[in-house]
Amino acid sequence: MADQLIRAVAANGGIRVVGAVTTRLVEDARTRHRLSYVATAALGRTLTAGALLVSNMKRADSRINLQIKGNGPLDGILVDARLDGSVRGYVGNPSVELPLNPQGKLDVGTAVGPRSEERRVGKECRSRW
């Protein structure tokens, strides 16, 4: 199945929903960057977030940059997404491996470290957490 971005509108435009299937995008990133499992999960989530966020922009040349910095062993994530559907990104340490968390899942939170995010739209920073 090809990657898809699906939009829906309900309640006379009062409700908008956007969903994405990005399996191929994430698999391509995994093979190109030789990512570990936890790095694949972290970058894949951020690539998908970039695609979802940029899909709500209006101008044809719109783009969004997501930079996630933490003090974890992953050493940060950077994603660039454009309205034309192109999405790219990388992680600072693609080979990081961690044991599963107590719930038996990939420990993406520990890999990234404490939260410090920045969202940039074009060249101007619109918001910061």
Predicted features, each with a name:
Residues 2-116:
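N-terminal functional module of multi-domain proteins
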Residues 118-125:
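Conserved small/polar residues in nucleotide/adenosyl-binding loops
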